[in-house]
Every structure is written in C-alpha cells, then in structure tokens.
Amino acid sequence: MLSLLNPKAESIQRAQALQVNISAAIGLQDVLKSNLGPTGTTKMLVDGAGAIKLTKDGKVLLTEMQIQNPTASCIAKAATAQDDATGDGTTSVCLLVGELLKQAELYIREGLHPSLISDGFNLAKNEALTFLDSFKTDFEVDREVLLNVAKTSLSTKISSKVVESLAPAVVDAILTIRRPDEPIDLHMVEIMKMQNRSASDTQLIRGLLLDHGARHPDMPKQVKNAYILILNVSLEYEKSEINSGFFYSTSEQRERLVESERKFVDNKLRKIVELKKEVCERDPTANFVIINQKGIDPLSLDVLAKNGIMALRRAKRRNMERLQLACGGVAQNSVDDLNPEVLGWAGSVYERTLGEEKYTFVEDVKDPKSATILIHGPNTYTIQQIQDATRDGLRAVKNAVEDNCLIVGAGAFEVACAAHLRNKFAAKEVKGKAKMGVYAYADALLIIPKTLAANSSYDTQDAIVALQEEASEGYKVGLDLKTGMPFDPEVEGIYDNYRVIRHMLHSATVIASNLISVDQILRAGRSSLKEGPPQ
C-alpha cells in the first residue's frame, strides 16, 4: 500500500522495526555506559577542524556527537532535555532506556505483545514514583550536607583533588545568592576562567570579577573602602541619532564647535567629580570608583585620573545587574540627580594582569547577592572540564535546596525500588501479563548499580547479589566503589537529587514505551517525492 502512495518511500515493519529501535538504544547505551560514576572513563571528542574536547559529561557528549540514527537521536534529545530541566541524569536516562528495551525484547521474543509490556512499564513507573516519595530523605538547609551533594555531583566529572577545592566554592556561591522564599537565580553566579596555576586553586569571590581593567596609566590600580558609581552614561561625544551636519568656514568657528562639544561631556564630569569630593569630605579614607556600561573618551579618563578616580568603561550588560546585587547602589542613566545614596560599596577593588589580559576584582562587599567562581587551570581542556562540572554542581546544590529532600546515592534507590517492584508490587497488586512488564522494569533499574560496579572493575553479579541481600533486610544500601561491597551511602554523604531521579523515571519510561510500540518505520521525506527526469 505504501508503494502505491509513494514509490520511493522506504519502510521497515513489525519485528524488524522493533529490532532497529532496540539496537539503536543499546548502541547509545554502550557508548555512554563507561562514563557513569566517579570511576567512569573520559571521552575525547575531535571535531572537523581537529579541535579536541575531553569530557565525561553525558550532555556534552550527546550534544557534540553527530548522531545520525533517528532512534538514537530521539533518545539523545530526551536525555539532553533532562539536563536542561534538572542539570544531571543525562547518562542515566540513556542507560535506562537501553536496558528497558533490552529487557522488553526478551519477553517479546517469547510472544508477549509490546502493548502489554508498555502497560507494565507505566504501572511500574507510577509505583516507582510513589516509592521514591517514601524513599527520600528530608533535610533542612545545612552546609555540610550541601557539601556532600556538591561532591557527589562533581566527583562524576572531575578528579577528587579538584572536587575538594571546588565543592566549597559551589556551595558557598549558592548560599550567597539564596534569598528566603525566592527561587535561586543561577545567572547571579558568574563563572570566570584564568589559564594559570593549577585546577585546585579554583576559588569563590564574594563579589564580582570583571574581565577588563582601568584604561588610564595614572589611575589607581588598587583602592580600599571604595564607593562605586554604576553608570550607563556616555562620557564621550556621540553622533546625533538623526542625520545632521555642521559647517565652518574659519578655524575659530571650528574651535568653538569643538569647545561646545567638549563642554557637553565636561558638564557630566563636573557633576561626577563634585559627588566624589562630597563623599571623600565625609570619609577621608574613602576612594571613588566608576564602572560605566558605555564609553569614556581619553580626555575624560584624564580628568578622572587627575581626581584620583578609578574608572572602568564598557562593562558587560550582564555584569551591571550583578554589580548592583553584589555592592548595592543603583545604576544611573543620567548624572543630573547624583547623590551618595546611589553609590555601592566594596572594601577592596583592585586590578590584576595575566599576560595581556587585565582583570578587576570587586571584593569584601557587605551583603552580596551575587558571586563569582574563578576557575584556574593549566590548559583549556582542564578549564572546560571544570566549567562543565561547576555548572552541574551549582544545579545539584540548587535542586537540593529547593526540593528540601535528597535521595541516597550509589545505586541505593535503584536496588530498593527493583526489589519493591518485583517482590511486593508485581507479586501482590498486578494481575495478568502486565506483570511481565513490571518484572522487566525492575530488572532494568539494576543497570545503574551494575554499571557502577563494572566501571569500578568489580564483578556485576557478585555486587548485585550482595546489594540485594542487604536490601532485603530493609537497609538502604549502595555500592562502595572502593571495595565493591554494600555500604550505607548516607554515612558517606553520597546523595542524588530527588527531581533528577523523578525526571529520569518519567523520561525513560515514556521513551521506552513509545519505542517498543513502533511497528513500522517510514523514511518518506520531501526529497524522496521528487520525480526523476521524464523518459
């Protein structure tokens, strides 16, 4: 029938279509499987231009790899959507989808209809979500617990030595910008990079770091007790917004024209200098700093330097809001109503030079609502890895604070949920052949602890049996990657995010259910409809 509708369309039907989907899902699973956990391996990505990227991050891999297979591409998009929504769980989604399809295939080969397995998957998912709510651990915001959350997330991406220095910076950044009863805005945490020193020198700045310095050699490079004027005012002569022209016939006329143009800017400078003198008369130890979003011409810089004012021009727009949150003060679009109340304050503002780059640090602020994480590293590969890990760590801590609950990690939830689904839910509450789908779902969940064991060079069967024996006695047990034996993850401070696990169960189940329900794959785009030349 399809050949009558479109002679050039390609079609794969029934068992063959299912096999194509299962093979694609398992293929993607095999690529990502070795990345999972702290002992996972790193992938090297080489693009068409020969640029190299080293990463363990599932989202980076799925985004950078050019996936041609439509089924694998579908899974990859869902997994990256998981990262966009929760900040983690990309690799876990791909592993779980692949394992769900692999387990489903075993029952389909025995003659069970895919729709019955799909029904079982949905029943198991709903029960797993209910079990997740009973399995979670409630907690009040505590720095030590949040440090463990950050370390759990970061250790899957970077080395343990770097984790020890980066985790406190990530947690303190979240606690700095957090406000009661308000959502946490991660845009208020700036991530800056410096290619120098070692990765373990990464630090948190409770303030702001600007990637440029003062533009005049006579300006002070370091000031204490700094009053900061945040401006969005042009301190240079600008062309008018409408087309206009001026004509002069003598040099005197030209001089008067230049003088009137200069007077326009000088009037603005006079008001700024008057404000500076007013502030310094009140507090003789005070210094004055201007951070302007627009330009400052050389003559204006000279005037400011003579008055001992440190001035930065063309600050990035995104930093203007962060600057107000970090230092206080109000950004001014005009110099007409300047007064000391609009000024921000910082205990220290200083400039540092690294190679040809200049950086300005704004530190020791009173009540920062914005912060900067400064990443150090010996090369671009290391810095990029730390940057990706930092973003994931910030999301993990943010999720924990907003959820007010955690899930013990190291595969503990998956082992406990699999036992619950198989021994209690399927055995007592599910009737008919849908029970097979629940069994398949329970077995598929074990892919997470199995992969953790395999990546740590332990026998997967020994590890799973030991975990199941401990879990059957009612304990929350995970896999100790150092010994390969069961242990209590809560004692070691290994936690996963509640919303990450919840989203993973939703996403993986929906994708797997849809893929096993496919009985025909059609390739019939516009290009296949083009007729050849007439004979």
Swiss-Prot record:
The keyword Chaperone applies. GO terms for cellular component: chaperonin-containing T-complex; cytoskeleton; cytosol; nucleus. Keywords: ATP-binding, Chaperone, Cytoplasm, Nucleotide-binding. InterPro entries: Chap_CCT_zeta (IPR012722), Chaperone_TCP-1 (IPR017998), Chaperonin_TCP-1_CS (IPR002194), Cpn60/GroEL/TCP-1 (IPR002423), GroEL-like_apical_dom_sf (IPR027409), GROEL-like_equatorial_sf (IPR027413), TCP-1-like_intermed_sf (IPR027410), TCP-1_chaperonin (IPR053374). It holds the Pfam family Cpn60_TCP1. It is found in: Cytoplasm. GO terms for molecular function: ATP binding; ATP hydrolysis activity; ATP-dependent protein folding chaperone; unfolded protein binding. CDD domains: TCP1_zeta. GO terms for biological process: protein folding. Molecular chaperone; assists the folding of proteins upon ATP hydrolysis. Known to play a role, in vitro, in the folding of actin and tubulin. Heterooligomeric complex of about 850 to 900 kDa that forms two stacked rings, 12 to 16 nm in diameter. Belongs to the TCP-1 chaperonin family. This is T-complex protein 1 subunit zeta.
